[in-house]
Structure formats: C-alpha cells, structure tokens
Design a protein with these regions (language model features):
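Histidine-centered metal-chelating micro-motifs
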Residues: 47-49, 68, 87-89, 93-99, ...
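A generic "binding-loop/recognition-motif" signal
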Residues: 55, 66, 95-96, 177, ...
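Short acidic-glycine-tyrosine-enriched beta hairpin
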Residues: 74-92, 193-209
Length: 234
C-alpha cells in the first residue's frame, strides 16, 4: 500500500518549543513502524534548547534557510556546525543535540524523520553531512548522491540518497526495503504508480514490494530526498 502526503499551510501546528510541524507519514497516518516523517519550520531567532531522544534516531534534511546544529561528541565536548540547504544531519539515539535559527529574517525549513528501532546505532559518527561533501553518480534518470551510508549514519539498516530526475526521464522500480519514501525537494513530477501530481513538498511513502514510477514531464530537473529502512540488525 502506498500513501501520498503534502505540506499545506493550514496543517502546520505550533509546538511548545516554538517551531511549526506538519505531520506527513506516521504510525497514525500510514501505519509506518520505522519512520515518522514531519516537515518542520523554525522561524527567525528561534533557539531550540539542547535535548536527547531515547526512542529513535533523528534525521534532518535542510530544505531552505541556514542554521546552527549543536552535537555532543563521545568525549563529552560539543561541536556546532553551520547547516545550509542540501545538508543532512543524522542524530543517533541518545545523542545530545540542538538546532537553532539565528537569522533576523530567514526561516529554517527542514524535513524531519524519526527512525524507530531496537538497539543503538554507532554514537561515534560525525552526524553532519554537508551537501558538497557527497559525490554525485550519473544514472539513467539523471544523478544520485548517497548522503546516508552505514559509515555516515552508524547503522546498516538505513539508506539515504538525493536523486535528480532530468526533464523527460523516469525513475521506476520496486521498494526493496521494509519502508521507503520519496520527498520532492524541488521541481514537479508525476507519479504513474499511483497516479498523482508530485509538487515540491509532496511525500510518496512505500512499503516493501510497492512499485513506483516517477516521471519528469516538465522542463526543469526534479530533486528528491529518498530514505529507506529495513529490519534492525543492531
């Protein structure tokens, strides 16, 4: 079974820490067991106090804006990274972290994914994957960037990539992981399976065995963030 979700201004909810969330694929909306996916907006001058999550790894993909990402290292020291559009952040379970937007005028938009599993991913990973650090591979549909590999996220069970579909090209296949999704970062595509328009901010959520066919019928490239997770082996 496949599910489609899209961001809408009236679906964003203000949270107690000051950010706005728009829930996409979750356990309630898509019967997802491994992923909880949310669009998140941090308005200007929003500082989110450092904290930990003890039930999941947390993944950020920066869509728009610039911010600061605080991460605690295994030796107890803290490192603050600059984050920008296209950067990916992987926070392993129980890692102290905080994300802030110090801009006077620019909001920080991110895709937030909680990955639920038993066990513990490697806490010694760096945690921040800058967009310009990921090599780009050519593909029949355009290009592929492997942003999340076992070395970058500390687990064999999660894979993350940024895909670019060129005009006139098609990305097609079958979900091979337990859960998988595509999120349209920019551009507009058409899903033939299931049939639907995929505008920027739309998520297509799949389970193992589901077929997908995403066509770029426009004149501009389409960029997708794709994440998949299998049964935990940690």
């Amino acid at each position: 079974m496949q599910y489609l979700f899209s961001q809408a201004e009236d679906r964003f909810q203000l949270r107690e820490w000051g950010g706005y969330l728009c829930f996409l694929a979750t356990a309630d909306s898509a019967a997802a067991r491994k992923f909880g996916v949310t669009a998140i907006v941090r308005m200007d001058q929003l500082i989110h106090d450092p904290h930990v999550h003890d039930d999941s790894d947390e993944i950020f993909y920066v869509l728009r804006g610039h911010g600061k990402q605080l991460l605690r290292n295994p030796d107890g020291t803290d490192t603050v990274y600059d984050i920008a559009p296209g950067d990916t952040v992987y926070l392993t379970k129980n890692r102290w972290h905080g994300t802030s937007n110090f801009s006077d005028s620019e909001q920080l938009d991110m895709l937030l994914i909680n990955y639920f599993y038993d066990g513990q991913s490697n806490p010694a990973i760096r945690g921040v994957v800058p967009a310009d650090s990921v090599p780009c591979e050519q593909a029949v549909f355009g290009s592929r960037e492997w942003v999340l590999t076992p070395e970058r996220c500390g687990t064999e069970n999660v894979r993350g990539e940024v895909l670019t579909i060129l005009p006139g090209k098609t990305l097609a296949g079958k979900a091979e992981a337990a859960e998988m999704f595509f999120f349209v970062v920019s551009g507009e595509a058409v899903s033939a399976v299931p049939e639907a328009r995929l505008a920027a901010g739309t998520q297509l959520f799949l389970f193992r065995g589901d077929e997908y066919r995403i066509e770029n019928r426009g004149e501009q490239a389409v960029r997708l963030f794709c994440l998949s997770a299998d049964d935990a082996q940690n």
